[in-house]
């Protein structure tokens, strides 16, 4: 059985970060996005099943690109949680 995947925007701090860690601890694949790449990398380095995808959600083309990158990496996205701004 494949692991489920969640994509969390605003995943570098606050609620987004807390949710990312919670889902990672439950065994999910977690993709996190935010503008601050250094914070994303700090989180993804601590958790094997968290991957970071830097993103400014105001850039519609980049959002689509990141969505496709995540889907290609994990085959599907089961939940999208938008915790931005």
Each model region followed by its residue ranges:
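The beta1-alpha1 cofactor-binding region of Rossmann-like NAD(H)/NADP(H)-dependent oxidoreductases
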Residues: 55-65
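Conserved NAD(P)H cofactor-binding loop of Rossmann-fold oxidoreductase domains
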Residues: 83-85
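Conserved glycine-rich cofactor-binding loop
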Residues: 10-14
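Aromatic pocket-lining residues of Rossmann-like dinucleotide-binding sites
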Residues: 23
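Conserved hydrophobic beta-strands of the Rossmann-like cofactor-binding core
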Residues: 5-8, 80-81
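Conserved glycine-rich Rossmann-like NAD(P)H-binding loop of the short-chain dehydrogenase/reductase
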Residues: 26-43
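A conserved hydrophobic alpha-helix of the Rossmann-fold in NAD(P)-dependent oxidoreductases
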Residues: 40, 63-70
């Amino acid at each position: 059985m494949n692991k489920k995947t969640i994509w969390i925007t605003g995943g570098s701090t606050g609620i987004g970060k807390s949710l990312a860690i919670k889902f990672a601890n439950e065994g999910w694949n977690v993709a996190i996005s935010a503008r601050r790449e250094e914070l994303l990398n700090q989180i993804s380095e601590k958790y094997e099943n968290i991957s970071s995808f830097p993103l400014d959600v105001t850039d519609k083309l980049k959002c689509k690109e990141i969505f496709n990158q995540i889907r290609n990496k994990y085959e599907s996205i089961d939940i999208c949680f938008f915790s931005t701004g």
